[in-house]
Amino acid sequence: MRLTASQTRLITDRVHQHFGAQAKIWLFGSRVDDCKRGGDVDLYVETDHPELLSELRCKISLEEALDLHVDLIVKKAGQNHPIQQIAKAEGVRL
């Protein structure tokens, strides 16, 4: 996994700040592969409170703090997209 311990803590803190402590977070995509370089931070979040405003604020907060592009996918009620299963199956739970 190509994130430092402090970056991982920052991500979990910010996501929990915006979505609550019950939010579950997965890192997926190129940052999971230690052999790759660069790339954005792909995050998948499951929460009981998937509000669009919280999603936007969280994304901006993470991008400013990490100085990296963040792709944030938040599961919404009734949604079941393939990317959600991929993120959970191939990703790393933070």
Predicted regions and their residues:
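Catalytic core of pol beta-like nucleotidyltransferases
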Residues: M1-W26, V32-G38, E46-L94
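Conserved RNP beta-strands of RNA recognition motif
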Residues: L43
